[in-house]
């Protein structure tokens, strides 16, 4: 049974989502501001977090940034009532695994949660993948290049894992989205592109200046060995 932490100052929505998700088999704890959320995170270890962009004592984006520093592999799904593209972009740039606009269909929220939890609980991943100067540990969620080590989010790790399986060969964007996000991309959905952009920043270029991850128009992405 998966444990969720729902962070939202909308008490009515929290109650509705908590009851719905409980009926769907989740154990739900709710926090209504950033301070409560930090206390809950210290006291418990949720399997995933649902986080609202707007909180009464600060930005949910700031809390997300802290979450990513302290719990890089913890799945985080963001909610926003503002519907601003900038919120979505910032959330994904800061490492949210997925993003939904409010009001959202509880069934879609449940499906997104199950997808991200399946990815986080996936078994059979190789413990270590080495390619040139890069070493990726799926178990630890870290990538090392020389002396530099970076922590990856769940989505970033799944993207890198898929690209390293076929170095030098493109992976179709829809196939990569299914592996990394657990769903297909909809029209104008740039979630995958944002995760790849974050991953590129963490990896940096090769010593000769070549990008490690290359985008091929109409074909997807590839890792350049």
Where do the language-model regions lie?
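Active-site beta3 strand of CheY-like receiver
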Residues: 44-50, 55
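DNA-binding patch around the recognition helix
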Residues: 123-128, 151, 194-225
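Short, Lys/Arg-enriched segments at the junction into DNA-binding effector domains
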Residues: 2-3, 114-174
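Conserved acidic carboxylate
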Residues: 8, 32, 55
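His-Asp phosphorelay/catalytic-motif detector in bacterial-type signaling
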Residues: 45-47, 71-75, 186
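Charged docking surfaces used in two-component/phosphorelay signaling
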Residues: 12-23
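Short hydrophobic/Thr-rich beta-strand motif most characteristic of the beta2 strand and flanking loop
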Residues: 25-34, 40
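Basic, amphipathic DNA-recognition helix from helix-turn-helix-like DNA-binding domains
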Residues: 59, 65-130
